[in-house]
Amino acid sequence: MRVLTGLQPSGDLHIGNYFGAIKQMVDAQEKSQMFMFIANYHAMTSSQDGEKLKQNSLKAAAAFLSLGIDPQKSVFWLQSDVKEVMELYWILSQFTPMGLLERAHSYKDKVAKGLSASHGLFSYPVLMAADILLFDTRIVPVGKDQIQHVEIARDIALKVNNEWGEIFTLPEARVNEEVAVVVGTDGAKMSKSYQNTIDIFSSEKTLKKQISSIVTDSTALEDPKDHENCNIFKIAKLFLDESGQKELQIRYEKGGEGYGHFKIYLNELVNAYFKEAREKYNELLEKPSHLKEILDFGATKARKIAQEKMQKIYEKIGL
């Protein structure tokens, strides 16, 4: 079963990115054909700063590799290194009704938040469809806010298949409900937009500051505390197995510890969990040529599959 996902190189990764998406990708490597790319074309909808995009792409590659993406088990590449995706994007646009794109929630939301209403942003779902359909993807792991884009890709695939025969595999969105939403320091969904993140590769000083900012209620130190509605507990349980969660729950119910104690505990959890990943991340950033070699290795494999797919499409469209 082929699984594909792409993540934009939009700066520092946070634990919401990891538990909401990256961990599932790493786990999927053992039982599925995992295709993963750094979506630098998509990132251009929010920034056209070339040097920043280049550096963020290298940082993203280092981050994903340090967190467990294995280029020997997964096909891992930079989106712009497989040009066929832009060719398919143009072809698919001929099968995409304007009304389908006008109904896209993501476009409306981003424009409402002040992002420029460019053609690139408007047609973002068509490029995402090209990413998915080019590789005959069966499963697309996404957050709830991206389900509609996978549905659009499926609609486009059906329209093309009705015209040309069964040329595209119909994709399905997969949402991990258990970690569909990772709460941020303010209790809302963790997001860079909300400035409520706990960043994976930040300094220990920054990490401590972010965890210290977690919003809690005013329950006194000596009193029992409600773990179910506590943002610290909601984040901490991501790092704990069932017995660890139970032990922490008992500490909450017993009383005698303040939220400051639990923040110190969470800080220790996060530091220990990502210690090796941080070390590897810093090592990789010092070797940009090695990162490029890894991305080139993945792009070669992805390009071969893409070219074979495009050859079939050329025959259908007369190119």
Curated annotation (Swiss-Prot):
Q: Which gene encodes it?
A: trpS
Motif 'HIGH' region in this chain: 9-17
Q: Does the record bear Lipoprotein in its keywords?
A: no
Q: What does this protein do?
A: Catalyzes the attachment of tryptophan to tRNA(Trp).
Q: Where in the cell is it found?
A: Cytoplasm
Superkingdom assignment: Bacteria
Which GO terms fall under biological process for this protein? tryptophanyl-tRNA aminoacylation
Please name the Gene3D superfamilies in this protein's record. Answer: HUPs, Tyrosyl-Transfer RNA Synthetase
Q: Name one GO molecular function term.
A: tryptophan-tRNA ligase activity
The UniProt entry annotates the motif 'KMSKS' region at: 189-193
Single GO cellular component annotation? cytosol
| Enzyme kind, highest EC tier | ligase
Q: How does it assemble?
A: Homodimer.
Record EC number: 6.1.1.2
Q: Where does L-tryptophan bind?
A: 131
Instruction: Print the keywords alphabetically.
Output: Aminoacyl-tRNA synthetase, ATP-binding, Cytoplasm, Ligase, Nucleotide-binding, Protein biosynthesis
Per its record, the protein catalyses: tRNA(Trp) + L-tryptophan + ATP = L-tryptophyl-tRNA(Trp) + AMP + diphosphate + H(+)
Q: What is this protein called?
A: Tryptophan--tRNA ligase
Which PROSITE patterns does this UniProt record tie to the protein? Answer: AA_TRNA_LIGASE_I
Q: Which organism is it from?
A: Campylobacter jejuni subsp. jejuni serotype O:2 (strain ATCC 700819 / NCTC 11168)
Q: Name one Pfam family in it.
A: tRNA-synt_1b
Indicate which residues the UniProt annotation says bind ATP: 8-10, 16-17, 143-145, 182, 189-193
Annotated family: Belongs to the class-I aminoacyl-tRNA synthetase family.
